[in-house]
Amino acid sequence: MMQFKNVLAAAALALGVSVPAVAQTAEDDGLDYKPYPHMFVGVQGGAQTTFTNYDNLKLITPTASVSFGAFFTPVVGARLHFNGWQNKGGFKDATQDFKYDYKYATSDLDLMLNLSTLFGKKNYYPLNVYLIGGIGLNYACDNDDAYANKNLMPLAYKNDRLSHNARVGAMLDWNLMKNLSLNLEVNANSLGDRYNSKTNGK
């Protein structure tokens, strides 16, 4: 079993839009369409940071994602989520202090639970809170800056690297109209140490 000290945590905050595909059947909630079940496509953009002993504010980078999913019931949904762009790492010891850049892409299969309908009395609310959890794979590349300092970071990789990704998060989603919603999502991701070429102690 992997110990906590060997796990890297990364967090992301993203603002996005979703485009649901819904049926045209009238419902008791006063809508002229049936909100569930439905499929959706989502796009997001935001910022992320990696939690190590280095200053997290200096490691903030842009992130973007696209997702394809469905809600099977008013409570339970799932999505295939693709996320990536840029990332930064930082190394600091008694004599060295520097940052390095690399790129990444992550794919996750996420379970989505609608807490608003789970604990509410209706099957539809214009404002919903989702709990998200998932697993997937992370791909990192263009790690030349870190590899150039391999004498200081023995875990630095030359070409590319695959890692597990485990995610937990929450989303606030506002249904603006029949086929458009606006959302704000925050999530935390667990990856292996080699993702950023070092252990958490550096």
Where are these regions (language model features)?
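Cleavable N-terminal export/targeting peptides
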Residues: 1-33
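Short glycine/proline- and aromatic-enriched beta-strand/turn motifs that initiate or cap beta-hairpins
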Residues: 23-69, 142
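Short loop/turn motifs that connect adjacent beta-strands in outer-membrane beta-barrel proteins
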Residues: 25-38, 75, 117-129, 176-179
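Residues that define the transmembrane beta-barrel architecture of outer-membrane proteins
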Residues: 37, 58-64, 101-107, 127, ...
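Residues on the lipid-exposed face of transmembrane beta-strands in outer-membrane beta-barrel proteins
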Residues: 43, 47, 66-70, 109-115, ...
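Outer-membrane beta-barrel translocator domains and adjoining extracellular loop/strand segments
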Residues: 53-60, 89-98, 141-153, 194-201
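Gram-negative (and chloroplast) outer-membrane scaffold detector with strong preference
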Residues: 76-149, 161
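Predominantly the C-terminal beta-signal and adjacent terminal strand-loop region
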Residues: 89-93, 102-104, 177-202
